């Protein structure tokens, strides 16, 4: 159990168009925090037709090639004696990207799976919309298929399907168990996403059950199931600004994970372990 904050693997920079700060800003912040590792994992580019259709705010493939990769390479070299800088992307699992994942992995250290869309009747639907039981099951099937592919080391906000769900029903339980079991089988780390707490407070989506605060994500019911299976867990800020690294919400989630005795890790097997 890691009980001291020493790394962060989920950060976004200005290229995604809904974050601030560049690679150097995050690296310097991590050095000041005395972290051993900082990973830059901005939202991965989509094919132009799909990005336009989804109106998804993220870098273009040209920005990825001309700005992102160069910035990461430069930071790795400049700070190699101070901190380990890892390069990555947070990206969805989509049929349209199947040929792109191996290319990304040839250029980066690792990929995070962040499934913000599911394909319903051949149309992509945002995970932040209200999902019915069948769509929750579809989310579970999609992320399990993604983990089976071997392309991803971390599953970001695995319980994000519950963003608009307060009643944790049997479908939520079944899909959660499906995801957790697959993460164990395919050696994918489950991420407790601190930004879910921030967003819950900002959007007033926190709620109470038996006088205990809960959030759409991180969702207590999900992480209680994770505890029963002892799956590997990583706490990440999902920072969209350098000052969102290691803030009061980060401390809160570390304390909660410690109380729950979750199997928290701060290194990725095969990458920096």
Predicted feature descriptions by range:
Residues 1-95, 166-174, 178-179, 194, ...:
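An N-terminally biased module of ancient metal coordination in phosphate/nucleic-acid-related enzymes
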Residues 47, 117-122, 199, 241:
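Conserved radical SAM core fold
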Residues 52-54, 58-191, 260:
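Extended substrate/RNA-proximal surfaces in nucleic-acid metabolism proteins
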Residues 22, 67, 138, 214-218:
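Short secondary-structure boundary/capping elements
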Residues 167-247, 255-259, 263:
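Active-site-adjacent C-terminal substructures of enzyme catalytic domains
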């Amino acid at each position: 159990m890691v009980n001291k904050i020493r790394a962060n693997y989920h950060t976004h920079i200005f290229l995604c168009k809904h974050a601030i700060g560049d690679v150097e800003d995050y690296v310097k912040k991590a050095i000041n925090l005395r972290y051993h590792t900082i990973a830059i994992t901005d939202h991965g580019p989509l094919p132009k037709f799909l990005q336009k259709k989804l109106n998804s705010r993220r870098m273009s493939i040209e920005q990825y090639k001309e700005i992102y990769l160069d910035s990461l390479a430069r930071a790795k070299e400049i700070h190699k004696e101070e901190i380990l800088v890892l390069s990555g992307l947070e990206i969805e699992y989509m049929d349209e990207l199947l040929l792109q994942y191996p290319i990304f992995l040839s250029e980066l250290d690792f990929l995070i799976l962040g499934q913000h869309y599911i394909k319903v009747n051949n149309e992509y639907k945002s995970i932040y919309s209200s999902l019915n039981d069948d769509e929750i099951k579809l989310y579970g099937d999609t992320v399990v298929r993604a983990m089976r592919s071997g392309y991803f080391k971390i599953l970001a906000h695995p319980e994000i399907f519950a963003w608009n769900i307060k009643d944790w029903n049997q479908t939520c339980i079944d899909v959660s168990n499906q995801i957790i079991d697959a993460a164990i089988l395919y050696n994918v780390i489950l991420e407790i996403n601190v930004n879910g707490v921030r967003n819950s407070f900002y959007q007033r989506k926190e709620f109470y059950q038996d006088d205990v605060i809960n959030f759409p994500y991180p969702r207590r019911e999900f992480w209680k199931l994770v505890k029963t299976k002892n799956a590997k867990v990583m706490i990440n800020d999902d920072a969209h600004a350098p000052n969102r690294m290691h803030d009061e919400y980060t401390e809160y989630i570390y304390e909660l994970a410690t109380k729950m005795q979750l199997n928290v890790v701060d290194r990725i097997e095969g990458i920096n372990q």
